[in-house]
Amino acid sequence: MHKAVGLDGRRDPHRVLKVLQEIDADIVALQEADKRVGGRGSTVPHELIDSHGMYKPVHLGVRHKRVFDKARKHAARLLKVNTRNIGWHGNAILVKRHVGVLDCAALELPTLEPRGAVIAELLIGDNPLRVVGMHLDLSGLWRRRQMRAILEAIDRRPQKMPTVLMGDTNEWRTEAGCLKELNGEFHLAPTGPSFHARHPVATLDRIIVHKDLNIEAAGVHMSAAARRASDHLPIWARVTA
């Protein structure tokens, strides 16, 4: 969501929520949802999400500890700061009000620059579902390491459940690079190119679904609002057990 800054150069969180309302998904994974400087607060304020009423953030309860590590002599003061972020390294998961949150976790990924992923274990009706939101590196080598780390983290989770990975993989290829790490356990939703929003030619954004789940439909949301809201178009998939 490009920190809520659209192609017109304006930061407009209302526009982000308008696009989410158009898509009307039960579960949303956002990238670049938090600021990179200062307290790293959310670019879509908590109060705005609450007043909008459609979604609730999955609260990870973590702080960006690297901010504090770089200023250890001020750590006591900094730890009192409410960062007001909704994610981890910019990754956030929003769910509709009827979706239950069983557990969640923030992952620190191997990287040369700050990168992370978020895990939410959810309950939709009687059906459990694990969702991973991610934003992988620009480097192909580090993307593969990061995807491997995410899959290993999933394997370590105490509860086994169907899993969907969503986010910006930064992978231009369809059957190579970090996607080879999936080893046939997952399949890619046929969403289509989502980058750049002005003229989408690259399928950088992916919805990756475990083979135990079915993909009923998938695509790219290409409304006028979506084309203005970010440099990436949102993608979607309808998944069933």
Give the residues covered by each predicted segment.
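Active-site regions of metal-assisted phosphoester/phosphodiester hydrolases
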Residues: M1-I27, K35-S42, D50-S51, Y55, ...
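Residues lining the SAM
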Residues: Q31
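Surface-exposed patches in mature extracellular/periplasmic domains of secreted proteins
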Residues: V58-G61
